[in-house]
From Swiss-Prot:
Catalytic activity: GTP + H2O = GDP + phosphate + H(+)
Gene3D superfamilies: P-loop containing nucleotide triphosphate hydrolases (3.40.50.300), Translation factors (2.40.30.10)
Lineage, top ranks: Bacteria, Pseudomonadati, Thermodesulfobacteriota, Desulfuromonadia, Geobacterales
EC number(s) reported in the record: 3.6.5.3
GO molecular function annotation: GTP binding; GTPase activity; translation elongation factor activity
Keywords: Cytoplasm, Elongation factor, GTP-binding, Hydrolase, Magnesium, Metal-binding, Nucleotide-binding, Protein biosynthesis
Role description: GTP hydrolase that promotes the GTP-dependent binding of aminoacyl-tRNA to the A-site of ribosomes during protein biosynthesis.
Domain tr-type G, residue spans: 10-206
Protein name: Elongation factor Tu
Species name: Geobacter metallireducens (strain ATCC 53774 / DSM 7210 / GS-15)
Region listing for G4, in residue ranges: 136-139
A Pfam family the protein falls into: GTP_EFTU
Source taxon at top rank: Bacteria
Amino acid sequence: MAKAKFERTKPHVNIGTIGHVDHGKTTLTAAITRVLAERGQAEFKGFDQIDNAPEERERGITIATSHVEYETEKRHYAHVDCPGHADYVKNMITGAAQMDGAILVVSAADGPMPQTREHILLARQVGVPYIVVFLNKADMVDDEELLELVELEIRELLSSYDFPGDDIPIIKGSALKALNGDKDELGSEAIVKLMDAVDAYIPEPERAIDKPFLMPVEDVFSISGRGTVATGRVERGVVKVGEEVEIVGIKTTTKTTVTGVEMFRKLLDEGRAGDNIGALLRGVKREDIERGQVLARPGSITPHTKFKAEAYILTKEEGGRHTPFFNGYRPQFYFRTTDVTGIVDLPAGTEMVMPGDNVAVTVNLITPIAMDEGLRFAIREGGRTVGAGVVSSIIE
């Protein structure tokens, strides 16, 4: 069969299934493809195809992830599902699979369990902005009051992590019934309801090009008679010739004007998200700007040294540390294009962190870096990656 052409007519949204082990995340993923395949909006993927997820390496970390894609009337979705709990943790922290929203799967028979809680916390920490709940295995609970209690418990749990628990859609159903072709209320009807809720409740993400301009500086050189050029890949937004930008991070923030934009040795009027450009900067000396700083729309990003983060520490097998680390650990933090030394504070009651752990830490950098919440970083020792993290909140 010929490969169908990817139609770019519908808006694209990235989602994923999260939740406790054996609550039915993979079964639900398979059920969604089955129900939508009947409408010609997906290719059916069986449980085993999704469960035997290939391992991928993201920033030196091995993660098993399954990717499926499907469409609804309104949208095109890319959906990630992970076989193991550790894979979820790694995925969410590294941003390997950036989620615009998530489907939290909770078994009606068990209610929220430890990993339910941990995945909600992670979603909050790493900036997964929206959650829709699928209350699975609802056919195993005969007591309507019990179902209502579980639903209430889920709403309270979501609210305790600053999600709008009262407003979040909760759809009851049985992923297994739907996967087996049952057309009743808990079977494929529930899947249709779920996808309607995802369509309606999870908004389209803001595209990189619509965000304020930011370009990490990778290299700097001077062109005699013309001035200083900073090169890098535009991360977001657009910069036009003649616009004012700020140089942020490492040193005191300064303003300059972009007097030229070059790409592949051609002069352009503007540089856009995704472009590798050279920006000619007015009145900037070669020594005023360095790798690790960013060019950004004035006022859109500020430099910081102290922040809270969620981090995953690589195992020995992944090429990480062989031993635990303790409070006051001083590795390098690699942000965008450069390493900065930082001191790690562990949470109260945590004596040490073992390879393979994930942990909430407070970090104090020795030099300021341009950052906002959600920024990803690597933790390195002498150029070797030993962990990955994401900024969850900025302190100063």
